UniProtKB/Swiss-Prot annotation:
Swiss-Prot/TrEMBL keywords: ATP-binding, DNA synthesis, Early protein, Kinase, Nucleotide-binding, Transferase
Protein name: Thymidine kinase
Quaternary structure (record): Homodimer.
Protein family: Belongs to the herpesviridae thymidine kinase family.
Amino acid sequence: MAARVPSGEARRSASGAPVRRQVTIVRIYLDGVYGIGKSTTGRVMASAASGGSPTLYFPEPMAYWRTLFEADVISGIYDTQNRKQQGDLAADDAASITAHYQSRFTTPYLILHDHTFGLFGGDSLQRGTRPDLTVVFDRHPVASAVCFPAARYLIGDMSMCALIAMVATLPREPQGGNIVVTTLNVDEHVRRLRTRARIGEQIDMKLIATLRNVYSMLANTSNFLRSGRVWRDGWGELPLSCETYKHRATQMDAFQERESPELSDTLFAMFKTPELLDDRGVILEVHAWALDALMLKLRNLSVFCADLSGTPRQCAATVESLIPLMSSTLSDSESASSLERAARTFNAEMGV
């Protein structure tokens, strides 16, 4: 966190009752493949005012994953894949364990989202409105509920059944959400991963390649929905998501962000799979409802991309330069103070 958030009462009403000061909030979710530098960028943004406004930072819930409970989920999910590859764990058992660990990644994000989403206010403002407060989150729930499970599914570490179950937990985003998908060239990405050498974490190039593609799909999904289209547009002509599709999705940068994407460039394409279709090749209604829900939950998210190849300060400046393009909401000073308290508590409890 940087400077204190806007607080106090701006004026009193005609009756003499205090009127809460209005506060314009920009909220940013830094996301992307692990090890790029988003956490460092978020901390730097919080160490000084972003665009002149106070900045709060909510870090990754590392303690929740590693020390608060009996199992370290980061070490556990990688160890599960190692045991499968060594023949010590059957593929079906490994898939079930992987899904369990992936759900553990999601829990703290869902809790945090539930606690904070009502504090941002419901009135969306014109893009370019100067914020009174910038709130930076280290990942959105879409990371652990959709993107990472999707990558695990495409690799073969999780089933479609488990993926759909995870996707269903994604909370609906209120107006004003901004995701910045952080990117980096592959060589520098690997160098940074080796430098940080996080305990239990592995440099899994297949997972990294797949995640890069999935995050491109996320950006394309946002662009697709922003154009006014829905997942049913072009569904009939979309080919099945078969082993060829999965193989392509694991190849480095096989998917790229597109300003005018087709349905095949989006996250929705991977769900046209036999497990979700009837004997005629028609998607079952219950699964169609799941895709409807996913579409509604993603619709209020604006997705941006930012290259983090510079110094930490340069990376923070890159993200800050996007703020005039971002959505913002109108809240009040009491909610802003609640966000400040929440950020202070989350930082204190989630550090390891």
